[in-house]
Amino acid sequence: MRYIKGRSNLSCTIFVPWDCKNHCKFCTSKQMYKERTCDIDAIIAQIKKINENPLIQEFVLTGGEPLADLEQCQKLIDVMEKPVYINTTFPTFAEIPGTIETAKIMTMIDFINKNDKIGGLNISRHMHQKFYEDVLPINVFAHLIKKHIKLNVVLSKEFNLEEFKQFVEPYRPLENVSICIRADYRNITKDTLKNRDDVFEKLILEYEYESSGGCMVCNDDRFWDGDTLISYHRGLEHSKVVYGNKIFVNDILITIDGQIYDDWDLVTNTEFERWIFGEFKLDEDVSEYENDPVYVDWLLKKNGEEGIL
């Protein structure tokens, strides 16, 4: 089998080795935190290897709740040599429900602003489900954050346009916030991934359509509501695509115990690890890598051969 980069912005998603208090319906990682042992040193060792691979453009920290332990989070960021994006609910971390501890919040915001490696935040705010933890109103703190914020709105029920408009209204004046409607991946198949479904039809009649894009396992439709970007994202449950003897990789996953995988089914594959870490030699057929000369150069030099750049 030959591993191929499936999308231009190939990223490495890392599950932080500490859990959150939420129980989101669509969450795929809750069981992991019950069954596996957290090992930050093993994760750091994998990050250092990933840093070398020029195919991988960025890191994503997810969880769990990355911002629940800023000290440990900083340890992970310190060893990264690529931009990192953080998935978070931006909880209040208050001891008393319904209160906001300003000092803790400002510490969190300073952490984000002062980390040059943090490229942005992906903040979850769901229309039909409340979190177990109190979360901060984005319109209260967004103007204090110097990074882009993508507001992820996961759909768990039928899409109601009027309800959606009311839901996002407080965020429209915020210049550093874009809205991303995310379909429940459990309801998407390869046959419906690129279809103009009911949500798309409602959005295009209400907002200014810009473009559509994506990769083999996801689709993004972009619209504008004045100066506010609204995107509609659909993704498949699995990020790996197999055709013949080729495996197209669209995401790289590192779990809380430092194991690395090519798909969300979390099945170990030593061939994949050799591809990611450059532990194989190119044969005469390198056509799949012609568009990535930097990767070819890195692989050759890693194996003691003369590079091409």
Give, region by region, the residue ranges found by the protein language model.
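Core AdoMet radical
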Residues: S11, T28-I40, P54-D69, E81-K104, ...
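Short, acidic/polar
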Residues: I40-I47, I100-I112, N160-E169
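Canonical Radical SAM [4Fe-4S] cluster-binding loop centered on the CxxxCxxC motif
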Residues: M1-A45
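Radical SAM enzyme core and accessory elements
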Residues: M1-I4, I252, D257-L309
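Radical SAM enzyme [4Fe-4S]-AdoMet core and its adjacent flexible, acidic
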Residues: H126-F248, I252, I256-D257, Y261, ...
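Short alpha-helix within the catalytic core of nucleotide-sugar-dependent glycosyltransferases
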Residues: Q72-Q74
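Leucine-rich repeat
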Residues: I47-E52, L76-V79, I109-N115, V140-H143, ...
